């Protein structure tokens, strides 16, 4: 080997394995305004110190690998490495720690949620030194937020388009979700919209199956929507699910929806993927379509308390990728703690500036620098008796979705929709009069049912 090509160990490179914490655990580091900050819930394997576990997460999700490599000398590790800058034990849990990691902004492609997640959670979750790992929160710096388009329209533009103000919006998923022909499906849509709902919805798994192809469904739903609009004088929408097997097919369906003149389409953003979702969000902004987002598959990722990704992170990612509505749970009937946590990420979806508040699960102050907001959708097992609580908890900027609560009405879809609309209007009026919805909710619904036989039948 010639002297020019020989790599000499004496130059400063020393092969071999060394502890991650020697390089990647930096408690003296002061975070920069441009860093992406992550809070990981780390459960180390027995015998692994928390500092080593936290440093391992920082290393494996940035520049590190299991051994020292000579090519480290060709770049500036100090500039590009992730740093675990703080570790704290989780109160009430044995051998669980919150590890805070700072990533330099240069590690990420601009405007790509896909690249952000590939970097931060792509490889590290199978790491042997960890028994479990959960990404609890991310702080997205304004410099990175500004590289994203975000929601196609946002809350204010949606209200302007629909001409609906001063109350939550009402929706309903068409049931049975699978098996109806396109014409019968359209009929169910018409009945619900005619009765007083603002929106009806394709279920997340309604795409283009043999019993109902997407084009037929789009045509009959558009007919139902325009007929209900003509009868009621209100603007109506049906979330036409454009999710498909390829991005090209998805955009083709969105183009057809736009040509029909409908106001909104829908996407399953986790099963469809962030690349597809961002493409659709860009198309929707350019062509005046609202975009409803369903979170099918989220529980696979976020249900375990010590492993996976918390939904607040998936919600932040959706706001960056783009969507005007997203399902956010209901909180009705759940534990108080879960209510606070849910309202924490509801604020992260809607508000422009959210202060750090650990009691609500918000680990970092988040500034969205005027990125449009997303309407949270409450759906799943709710009915008219829940209306006072939902109106109080979610406020006006929300979509309340009563699927079985509408279609399960003993008199049919249209009376079910009437019952929901009357209950909502009664709760909004009572709230505006200063009444306590939490205490007087049942009385408010019963009062309204005296002059609405449809609501009385639903009660």
Swiss-Prot record:
Q: Highest taxon of the source?
A: Eukaryota
Q: Which residues bind Mg(2+)?
A: 201, 203-204
Cofactor stoichiometry and binding remark: Binds 1 Mg(2+) ion per subunit.
Question: Which residues are annotated with the PTM N6,N6,N6-trimethyllysine?
Answer: 14
Q: Subunit structure of this entry?
A: Heterohexadecamer of 8 large chains and 8 small chains; disulfide-linked. The disulfide link is formed within the large subunit homodimers.
Q: Name the PANTHER family for this protein.
A: RIBULOSE BISPHOSPHATE CARBOXYLASE (PTHR42704), RIBULOSE BISPHOSPHATE CARBOXYLASE LARGE CHAIN (PTHR42704:SF15)
Q: What is this protein called?
A: Ribulose bisphosphate carboxylase large chain
* Organism the protein comes from: Corynocarpus laevigatus (New Zealand laurel)
Gene behind this protein: rbcL
């Amino acid at each position: 080997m010639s002297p020019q090509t020989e790599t000499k160990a004496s130059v400063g490179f020393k092969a071999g394995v060394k502890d991650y914490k020697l390089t990647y655990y930096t408690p003296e580091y002061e975070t920069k305004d441009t860093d992406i900050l992550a809070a990981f819930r780390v459960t180390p394997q027995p015998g692994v110190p928390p500092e080593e576990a936290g440093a391992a997460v920082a290393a494996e999700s940035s520049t590190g690998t299991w051994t020292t490599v000579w090519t480290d000398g060709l770049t500036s590790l100090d500039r590009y490495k992730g740093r675990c800058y703080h570790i704290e034990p989780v109160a009430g849990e044995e051998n669980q720690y919150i590890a805070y990691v700072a990533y330099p902004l240069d590690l990420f492609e601009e405007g790509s949620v896909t690249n952000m997640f590939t970097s931060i959670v792509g490889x590290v979750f199978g790491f042997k030194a960890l028994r479990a790992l959960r990404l609890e929160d991310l702080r997205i710096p304004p410099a990175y937020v500004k590289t994203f388009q975000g929601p196609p329209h946002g809350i204010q533009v949606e209200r302007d388009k629909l001409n609906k103000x001063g109350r939550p919006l009402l929706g309903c998923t068409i049931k049975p979700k699978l098996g109806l022909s396109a014409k019968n499906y359209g009929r169910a849509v018409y009945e619900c919209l005619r009765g007083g709902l603002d929106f009806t919805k394709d279920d997340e798994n309604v795409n283009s199956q043999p019993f109902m192809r997407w084009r037929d469904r789009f045509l009959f739903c558009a007919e139902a929507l325009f007929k209900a609009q003509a009868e009621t004088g209100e603007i109506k929408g049906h979330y036409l699910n454009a999710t498909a097997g390829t991005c090209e097919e998805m955009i083709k369906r969105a183009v057809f929806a736009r040509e029909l003149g409908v106001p909104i389409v829908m996407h399953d953003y986790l099963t469809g993927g962030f690349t597809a979702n961002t493409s659709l969000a860009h198309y929707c902004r350019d062509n005046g379509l609202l975009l409803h987002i369903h979170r099918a598959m989220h529980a696979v990722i976020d249900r375990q308390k010590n492993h996976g990704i918390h939904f607040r992170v998936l919600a932040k990612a959706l706001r960056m990728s783009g969507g005007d509505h997203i399902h956010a749970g209901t909180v009705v009937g759940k534990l108080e703690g879960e209510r606070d946590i849910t309202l924490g990420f509801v604020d992260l979806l809607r508000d422009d500036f959210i202060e750090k508040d650990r009691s609500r699960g918000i680990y970092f102050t988040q500034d969205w620098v005027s990125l449009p907001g997303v309407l949270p959708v409450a759906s799943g097992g709710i009915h008219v008796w829940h209306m006072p609580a939902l109106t109080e908890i979610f406020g006006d900027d929300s979509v309340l979705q009563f699927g079985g609560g509408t279609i399960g009405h003993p008199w049919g879809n249209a009376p079910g929709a009437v019952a929901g609309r009357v209950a909502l209007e009664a709760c909004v009026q009572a709230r505006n009069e200063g009444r306590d919805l939490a205490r007087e909710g049942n009385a408010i619904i019963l009062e309204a049912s005296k002059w609405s036989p449809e609501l009385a039948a639903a009660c």
